[in-house]
């Protein structure tokens, strides 16, 4: 199913990064010199009319400063009531702020998958309401979602924390990708070497 709708990006950059030892969003790539949040945003910008970066209250100001001159990038802080709900809370905060984009597809990427390429993201953009899947597992945070603010709000009020619950409610389907290595989620710095 070819996608003809507007795409909006969501970069999930509000995680605690406790196992990583420093905020993953600001970890600098040795090759490009850019932070992981900058790299993730740069992969979405060619495909998206707007990119929203989901931030926690600790990194919000630094992210605003980093992207201050970019009119197509907006930093969205976690909603206080749902700040401990992980990625689901971040996606909700963005969709609440993105009410003008109710007809858009939302391309969701976590900041800690630095090996994802424009090729995989471009393919995902062609398949509305799908998430990435490889032989080794489901990658629920690499997804092309419909606007789902009401569903998210309901899940959060039920104290649901699982992204999978959102995908089930939206009838989101898996999209198979062959290259496992590009979908590596980095939780420890030693996984980079």
Enumerate the predicted regions with their spans.
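Nucleotide and nucleotide-moiety/phosphate-recognizing core
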Residues: 2-139, 147-160, 168-182
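Short, glycine-/aromatic-enriched active-site segment of Class I SAM-dependent methyltransferases
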Residues: 143
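Short, conserved phosphate/pyrophosphate- and ester-handling motifs at nucleotide-, phospho-/glycolipid
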Residues: 146, 188
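Short amphipathic alpha-helices within nucleic acid-binding modules
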Residues: 151-152, 191-193
């Amino acid at each position: 199913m070819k996608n003809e709708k507007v795409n909006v990006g969501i970069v999930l950059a509000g995680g605690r990064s406790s196992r990583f030892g420093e905020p993953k969003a600001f970890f600098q790539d040795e090759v490009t010199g850019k932070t992981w949040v900058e790299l993730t945003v740069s992969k979405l910008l060619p495909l998206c009319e707007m990119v929203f970066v989901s931030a926690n209250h600790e990194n919000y100001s630094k992210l605003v400063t980093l992207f201050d001159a970019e009119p197509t990038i907006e930093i969205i802080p976690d909603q206080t009531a749902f700040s401990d709900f992980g990625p689901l809370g971040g996606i909700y905060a963005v969709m609440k702020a993105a009410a003008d984009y109710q007809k858009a597809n939302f391309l969701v990427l976590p900041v800690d998958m630095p090996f994802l390429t424009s090729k995989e993201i471009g393919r995902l953009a062609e398949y509305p309401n799908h998430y990435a899947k490889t032989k080794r597992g489901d990658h629920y945070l690499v997804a092309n979602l419909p606007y789902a603010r009401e569903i998210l709000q309901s899940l959060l009020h039920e104290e649901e924390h699982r992204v999978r619950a959102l995908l089930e409610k939206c009838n989101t389907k898996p999209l198979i990708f062959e290259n496992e290595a590009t979908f590596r989620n980095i939780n420890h710095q030693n996984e980079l070497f």
